[in-house]
Amino acid sequence: MKTRKFQVVSSAVLALALACGAALKPAQAVTVNEPSGINLGGTSFFDALGKYTPGLVYQQYFQMQHFNAINDTNGNAIPVFKNTSITAIVSLNQFIYVSPYHLFGGVLGAMAIVPLVDLNASFAHDSPVRLVANRGMGVGDITWGPFIAFPPVIRGGRPVFAQRMEFDVISPSGSYDTSKDINPSSGFWSINPYWTVTLLPTAKTELSARFNYLHNFTNSHPASSAPLPAGTTTQAGDAGWVNFTASYEVLPKLNVGLNGYYFKQFTD
């Protein structure tokens, strides 16, 4: 059995981790899709605060991502891909259930995210390598998992600190065509636990951080538009990142601020 490991090099619903460099023949190119359920920089203000009474919450988010280059593990554009244009439009549908049960003072619940992904990709006609996308709207990988949310710490009559822990599983349940290089689904299982905290230093300021870890399991049926040797497997490396936000209340119930993330891959 041949096993190939790749480095995840981009943030988004689809991230292309390619083992091919400039010297790699087109017939040998293999792509690894980053799991479609991970949250890179999408965390909003007051991240650790939420619903603490039993019930169901539905939220929807829209994202548009565009890539104009495919990079190697050093962050350099791979020259065999000319005039790269890859676009993903994503609708994230999140369902949150808060149970009536408690543990260690926190509220127990569960969460699921169902992404709908619209993919499109094009390359120059004379590009030495042109990746094939699973075009059109398709279901991405479903993310689900339990969480424990701790009610905010109250000081001076107002909340000053809150935290939540969640253990997410990303299931390869989305649309996946092994004859296409780019798919809504990654084609493999992943686990993505995180811990999020929100600090309220003053009545008008907010700071939040979500600390994430990602472990990707082996893909025994890697997708590729070119034939692969029998028994070929792929595996994206483990990674960690932190989403962060900072905001200020400019009007009652209206905060303005910034958000971002720092991403680090630990293994290839």
Describe each model-derived feature in a short phrase:
Residues 1-35:
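Cleavable N-terminal export/targeting peptides
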Residues 31-32, 46-55, 67, 100-108, ...:
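Short loop/turn motifs that connect adjacent beta-strands in outer-membrane beta-barrel proteins
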Residues 34, 63, 77-79, 221-268:
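Outer membrane beta-barrel transmembrane domains
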Residues 36, 56-66, 110-116, 163-171, ...:
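Transmembrane beta-barrel strands of outer-membrane/channel proteins
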